[in-house]
Amino acid sequence: MEMASAFTLNVRLDNIAIITIDVPDEKMNTLKAEFASQVRAIIKQLRENKELRGVVFISAKPDNFIAGADINMIGNCKTAQEAEALARQGQQLMAEIHALPIPVIAAIHGACLGGGLELALACHGRVCTDDPKTVLGLPEVQLGLLPGSGGTQRLPRLIGVSTALEMILTGKQLRAKQALKLGLVDDVVPHSILLEAAVELVKQDRPSSRPLPVRERILAGPLGRALLFKMVGKKTEHKTQGNYPATERILEVVETGLAQGTSSGYDAEARAFGELAMTPQSQALRSIFFASTDVKKDPGSDAPPAPLNSVGILGGGLMGGGIAYVTACKAGLPVRIKDINPQGINHALKYSWDQLEGKVRRRHLKASERDKQLALISGTTDYRGFAHRDLIIEAVFENLELKQQMVAEVEQNCAAHTIFASNTSSLPIGDIAAHATRPEQVIGLHFFSPVEKMPLVEIIPHAGTSAQTIATTVKLAKKQGKTPIVVRDKAGFYVNRILAPYINEAIRMLTEGERVEHIDAALVKFGFPVGPIQLLDEVGIDTGTKIIPVLEAAYGERFSAPANVVSSILNDDRKGRKNGRGFYLYGQKGRKSKKQVDPAIYPLIGAQGQGRLSAPQVAERCVMLMLNEAVRCVDEQVIRSVRDGDIGAVFGIGFPPFLGGPFRYIDSLGAGEVVAIMQRLATQYGSRFTPCERLVEMSKRGESFWKTTATDLQ
């Protein structure tokens, strides 16, 4: 049976050809290798029709132009040569589009990313809609790749090398007005007139190319270029710590094209694409992409979710304010905040105002849209307006009696169907639900701080939580723009449980004499966004260490913190960034002063600050404990799958994405190697490093957690 075409040609009465992109049975348009023959057949027809005045590419999808190439194509390549051939095929197709003797215009609405933008770049002009859904970018670097269909060569010539490098090296996505300002698109119009605007551009013959800004012209010359690539290379190396080979290859390929011409540039691009596709970093990053896509499709349970029309929040603090913001402004749901203090409500409202006003200032949002979103948030000091809320999120202090009281009050003041979701980070959900009259509607919904930035939420049903409550809470989390994982109601849940031994070990090394900055730098070099000591300062030392006794009580000695260290720090009124002093000292709010390690920390904890461990040794001790605990979590069914475990670690605590998560990383080392390292560390440093039974068994059998493909679980 012949495959339905993703590209359809229609010629209007005014002799302008419209090529409509509509991948059958898919929500998103993605480019597949098999579409090449369809496009070539259309190009042949275009060349044969001598009456044609021009061509417009447009999507039939309601909210995307082309979201990129189908990543499965890369996974199907077994060698670098196969992946290189794939890139060359894409380059050739784009070259054929660009070589058409009549004007070719891309009419862009929605996501125009990766291969989609490369197709648009191959056109002679581009017009896009002013819709917030319209974004343009080359995000391949986030998959450990580079643009392989000419993007590294066409973009620098269109918008200038420094701007193009920023886009390609970061995967940054531009909104319509930014794209217009940079010259990436020729016009921005309302969606209703997109096609006609593109047709008008065709009738102007070829759009006149605007000259590059003076700065970009200087940087394109040999001297400016040498200086630019040296500076950008240095900055990129500092940012990536040498862990992402794609960034180095991007710089190399773009420079080759500018110095030696496009032919050499395309050749270097295809070759680098093929080689990068085979790197373990790209394979790991693609596995994270597939896993997160999979998690987003997971309903959490087999039951249908209940309707969600409005939400209530208890507590207007930092977490409550952040949760209100994502509920109103991302999920689009009316939110009512209850706080015993009017100042708490004002704080929560100001939090959302600050976020939205920042978007208005950056011209990402209209003032009228800001006001519309803010109008969804209201506050009260009692339960007025709570009677018909479908779900209440509790974000009050970590106190069991207080949370149980909140459950009782919600059951008394809200509808019989109302779900109670606790944002606890450490208290068992079963205990919070212990006195509930409707325990099946009590669940944990654990956000991470700052709420608007952290993508993960943990959803924690207790033994009596209903399947519908789980499904409804998962539905809300997705509407809020979060990636939810469902975890078991055990102390620390998943993320805090694997994080605690990692932080504890860092503190232990401090007491042994390692310096704060050495420990943090070692873990940043390993691939974490910040080191464990700085992380504790950012979270708040009082908040971050509160869970340690809970975990020690539940799991024993392996979770114990070094004696008296935490209490000494807290007794010295050190809470971290929030009060200006922790392990580091912070300048006054609003002032741009670098944080500095406080030398007084060493005598305070009885340490010398004269370490002997190398950076890899420091990282090994912290990371191995995290891996061991993650495996225990699978064994105890705290997480439902290793997919959730990898996503939870990467999105929840910044586990290095290029390693693919704890379970991918164990597989890459081999269970046998992990066991050998842990046994060596146990001999040197104590029984907390004893590898768990599951790891030892896997080592004996030569087993791994994942199958070889990026998308399948074993």
UniProtKB/Swiss-Prot annotation:
Residues 306-714 are annotated as: 3-hydroxyacyl-CoA dehydrogenase. Pfam families: 3HCDH, 3HCDH_N, ECH_1. It catalyses: a (3S)-3-hydroxyacyl-CoA = a (2E)-enoyl-CoA + H2O; a 4-saturated-(3S)-3-hydroxyacyl-CoA = a (3E)-enoyl-CoA + H2O; a (3S)-3-hydroxyacyl-CoA + NAD(+) = a 3-oxoacyl-CoA + NADH + H(+); (3S)-3-hydroxybutanoyl-CoA = (3R)-3-hydroxybutanoyl-CoA. It is found in: Cytoplasm. Pathway: Lipid metabolism; fatty acid beta-oxidation. One of its GO terms (molecular function) is long-chain-3-hydroxyacyl-CoA dehydrogenase activity. The keyword Isomerase applies. GO terms for cellular component: cytoplasm. The record marks 118, 140 as: Important for catalytic activity. GO terms for biological process: fatty acid beta-oxidation. Residues 1-190 are annotated as: Enoyl-CoA hydratase. Its EC number is 4.2.1.17, 5.1.2.3, 1.1.1.35. The keyword Metal-binding does not apply. It comes from the Bacteria. Keywords: Cytoplasm, Fatty acid metabolism, Isomerase, Lipid degradation, Lipid metabolism, Lyase, Multifunctional enzyme, NAD, Oxidoreductase. In the N-terminal section; belongs to the enoyl-CoA hydratase/isomerase family. In the central section; belongs to the 3-hydroxyacyl-CoA dehydrogenase family. HAMAP family: FadJ. Catalyzes the formation of a hydroxyacyl-CoA by addition of water on enoyl-CoA. Also exhibits 3-hydroxyacyl-CoA epimerase and 3-hydroxyacyl-CoA dehydrogenase activities. Heterotetramer of two alpha chains (FadJ) and two beta chains (FadI). This is Fatty acid oxidation complex subunit alpha. The gene is fadJ.
